[in-house]
């Protein structure tokens, strides 16, 4: 365990003058992860499993007098969420608390502690997308979130742009066409609605141009911008500051069992004193897992 912070570590604060002390706590943006991941309550178990089912193909014609055809559904794959505990703590000596009371040092570091837990959640959520093209991070179906070969009954489907490209009018339109041609686990056409762009900070202005320009971006023609005129991506762009690729981008759809944060135990804050030293210990923990079930929730490209 790390040693408690002592008054000697904060000499400029506890000496008998009122210092102007910058507490190091910055304002933070609203939660970014919640724009992309839906929080759900986890079940009271060590892990949570979601079976992904497949149904039936198209119904065949039945000539007069012929018996009806039977088909079987089943489980295509299982997605398992394993709950993990995340936490951090700090300790303060009683002397430091007493002599540093003009900046309420316990409250200051409690805010730092809260920001550390928020940062963990943001990093874990962003890393689901940072590893979306990496075969070392498979989903329940055995391939990454973004893949050209998601297995389904009698074939595969792709949620990756056929030709890797940076964010542009053309690449965005091609991805939206791909979403329009989405199929279910039996290969039947389905209705997926593209909800929003997901981009790194370097693409925020390009995303704004593509989503809000009345005319087609990047050329001198007087063509309308079909993304805007049709009313696609009506939730705009979600910008995640912790995305590591400056060129990758994604389109999130309304697939119902998509990007999830399953909360097993919400944030718990505890404080206790040490009888022998009079130090105070502060701890915060929470337990959850973040990931995805249906990869149709995201279509993407790593860019070039």
Protein language model annotation of sequence segments:
Residues 79-84, 94-95, 135, 143, ...:
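Flexible, active-site-adjacent loop/turn segments at secondary-structure boundaries
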